[in-house]
Regions:
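Flexible, surface-exposed loop/linker segments and immediately adjacent secondary-structure boundaries
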Residues: 1-31, 36-39, 44-120
Length: 120
């Protein structure tokens, strides 16, 4: 769910860009995009928090958080820009189910907070 928006930020679903607004739901295959003055904060149901800086693009490829069914997945690619990550419950319950990809490598997330920047 979108928790914070500054400037131009968008949630892209099936190729359709919608201006991000507080309370907007983010689905497992959405892209998150910010322009030059944009910033976007998103919190997922496991309490993982992502903050995108200006000129950023995050491509979501998988998200599942179903502890009772033992189904966990979080995969995304930071194609450009900056991202602050604060881990939620998924990294406690299934750390190997979480991965952040960049054009330069993969970050395995095991219960932490970090900032990553991709220059393209």
């Amino acid at each position: 769910m979108v928790k914070a928006v500054k400037g131009q930020a968008f949630v892209v679903t099936a190729g359709h860009a919608a201006p991000a607004s507080i309370g907007m739901l983010v689905h497992q295959t959405d892209d998150l995009v910010t322009d030059g003055d944009g910033a976007l904060g998103v919190t997922f149901i496991d309490n993982t928090t992502l903050s995108l800086g200006a000129n950023s693009k995050l491509i979501m490829t998988a998200y599942a958080f179903q502890p009772r069914a033992h189904r966990f997945a979080f995969a995304a690619t930071l194609a450009k820009g900056s991202l602050m990550w604060v881990s939620g419950r998924m990294t406690e319950l299934a750390p190997d189910a979480v991965a952040l990809y960049t054009p330069f490598g993969t970050i395995g997330v095991h219960g932490t907070r970090f900032l990553v920047e991709v220059d393209r």
